[in-house]
């Protein structure tokens, strides 16, 4: 009986080690495919690119703030046990003019909770329109850089780099990227995400190769 139990535990551990990594995306409308079909969003395109080599869970909600994300994250971590957490929040904080210190506190909670759950964190930064004033804008964008430095995180400085100022890639509201922009968003994320995947992928799936 002891031998059988030990064998079962060994097999369970081996299966877990071979399981593909699990990615949890916690974001707002930029990651929730707002205004387009879900299958067109960059998170869905990420799942397609990974092609079963990782499980992608999209817990993004349009309109979400960093405070809402921080409140939801503990349950998400417990439910999904992710290996990598992609944090894409702050845009709605900025558009509402919320204090950058509040954004930093909320993202800090999320980073620390993710790391306590042994997940790697990828921080996806965002910018806000210049009409909010340069001082506020600098303080806002600086939050992402400081947190990346403080917690030694990989950072995508601006998720919509090369997209936000191109009207052909934005919806009519000028805030949300359209379907044509989604592959470009994924291309902005991929260089920072790939090193984390390389660390968590089982040997049999590294470099895109299957046994």
Task: Describe the residue ranges of each PLM region.
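Serine-esterase "nucleophile elbow" of acetyl-processing enzymes
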Residues: 16-65, 72-81
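A general structural-boundary detector
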Residues: 4, 33, 56, 60, ...
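Intrinsic disorder/low-complexity signature
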Residues: 3, 15, 55, 204-207
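Bacterial N-terminal signal peptides
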Residues: 2-12
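Alpha-helical cap/lid subdomain in secreted, periplasmic
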Residues: 18, 45-48, 70-211
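Intrinsically disordered, low-complexity regions enriched in Ser/Pro/Gly/Gln/His and often acidic
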Residues: 12, 35, 183-184
């Amino acid at each position: 009986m002891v031998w059988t139990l030990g064998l079962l535990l060994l097999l369970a551990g081996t299966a877990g080690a071979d399981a593909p990594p699990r990615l949890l995306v916690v974001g707002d409308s930029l990651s929730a495919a707002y205004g387009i079909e879900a299958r067109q969003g960059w998170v869905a395109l990420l799942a397609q690119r990974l092609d079963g080599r990782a499980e992608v869970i999209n817990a993004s909600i349009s309109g979400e703030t960093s405070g809402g994300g921080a409140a939801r994250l503990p349950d998400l971590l417990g439910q999904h046990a992710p290996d990598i957490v992609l944090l894409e929040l702050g845009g709605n904080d900025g558009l509402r003019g919320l204090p950058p210190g509040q954004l930093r506190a909320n993202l800090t909670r999320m980073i620390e909770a993710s790391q306590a759950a042994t997940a790697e964190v990828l921080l996806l930064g965002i910018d806000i329109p210049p009409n909010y004033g340069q001082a506020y804008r600098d303080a806002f964008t600086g939050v992402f850089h400081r947190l990346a430095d403080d917690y030694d995180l990989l950072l995508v400085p601006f998720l919509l780099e090369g997209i936000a100022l191109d009207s052909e890639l934005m919806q009519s509201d000028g805030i949300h990227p359209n379907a044509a922009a989604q592959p470009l968003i994924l291309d902005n994320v991929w260089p920072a995400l790939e090193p984390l995947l390389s660390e968590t992928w089982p040997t049999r799936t590294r470099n895109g190769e299957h046994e």
